[in-house]
Amino acid sequence: MVTEEEVTAIGRTLLDAAQPLPARFRALFTLRNLGGPAAIDCIVRGFADSSALLKHELAFCLGQMRDRAAIPALLGVLQDSQQEPMVRHEAGEALGAIGDPEVLDVLRRYSEDPVVEVAETCQLAVRRLEWLQEHGEEPGSSPYRSVDPAPPAEETDVATLRAVLLDESRPLFDRYRAMFALRNLGGRDAVLALADGLRAGSALFRHEIGYVLGQMQDEACVPQLTAALRSRAENPMVRHECAEALGSIARPSCLETLRAFAQDEERVVRESCEVALDMYEYENGPQFQYADGLCRLQA
């Protein structure tokens, strides 16, 4: 049994800006896995940090934990225009992931936000909550054990799903459903169909493609992810997600690119490469788990 003192000690690592960012990320994911009020309190306190990357990951983890106790803090972040768009976006997505309809009115209001990534996120979260109300239950569990912003489409033909995915005239929710169906199907054709989505018009959509490709860990999409990370014209939110995907795929073909962009002028890209290089080492090393905060306490 993990004690509250141990949770608090892991929280201290998370909240210590003097610690290397990869160590703080590992502490965060340990807290996510442990759950409970003390873990949530530590995570919420991190929203005062200066790193948009870390704050966005805090919101992501709170959404994946699906604990209603996080709702007030996430609402505060979503409504705080001083927070970076990628942080507000992740707070909106987390509110959709938790799945409590009490936040619908706020999400509908922010579906008109002037920051397009925030508006699109809240539109998706509203549709997810409406889908849950219509179907009365969560979609079947993801093979990746993640809570996704849209349930997977029931279609299983890769070409049909690719057509929906890339159809800019379709509602974003439908395209996301195609995205998660392709991810769940897996295989080279599905990976390449998803990688084509990195050319889509919506930065939010492109960033989600990067995230999904990172989950799949298939080397077939390394050239497309590398091109997106290398593009200075690309939205930093997309570049960051592509960097982390390369760290997750963790093949030698990813390493040189991550090292090159670990000095990028965009802080979120720089930090993402730092975290991705740590993930690369984990994927290629002997460590039992990435979320190793408890092991570090006992070392």
UniProtKB/Swiss-Prot annotation:
HEAT-like PBS-type repeats lie at residues 54-80, 87-113, 174-200, 205-231, 238-264. It is an enzyme of class 1 (oxidoreductase). Catalyzes the hydroxylation of the N(6)-(4-aminobutyl)-L-lysine intermediate produced by deoxyhypusine synthase/DHPS on a critical lysine of the eukaryotic translation initiation factor 5A/eIF-5A. This is the second step of the post-translational modification of that lysine into an unusual amino acid residue named hypusine. Hypusination is unique to mature eIF-5A factor and is essential for its function. Belongs to the deoxyhypusine hydroxylase family. Signal peptide: none annotated. GO terms for biological process: peptidyl-lysine modification to peptidyl-hypusine. InterPro entries: ARM-like, ARM-type_fold, Deoxyhypusine_hydroxylase, Lipovitellin_superhlx_dom, PBS_lyase_HEAT. Pfam families: HEAT_2. It catalyses: [eIF5A protein]-deoxyhypusine + AH2 + O2 = [eIF5A protein]-hypusine + A + H2O. SUPFAM superfamilies: ARM repeat (SSF48371), Lipovitellin-phosvitin complex, superhelical domain (SSF48431). Fe cation 1 binds at residues 56, 240-241. Its EC number is 1.14.99.29. Fe cation 2 binds at residues 89-90, 207. One of its GO terms (molecular function) is iron ion binding. Keywords: Hypusine biosynthesis, Iron, Metal-binding, Monooxygenase, Oxidoreductase, Repeat. This is Deoxyhypusine hydroxylase. Gene3D superfamilies: Leucine-rich Repeat Variant. Pathway: Protein modification; eIF5A hypusination. The keyword Iron applies. Binds 2 Fe(2+) ions per subunit. It comes from the Eukaryota. Disulfide bonds: none annotated. Its cofactor is Fe(2+).
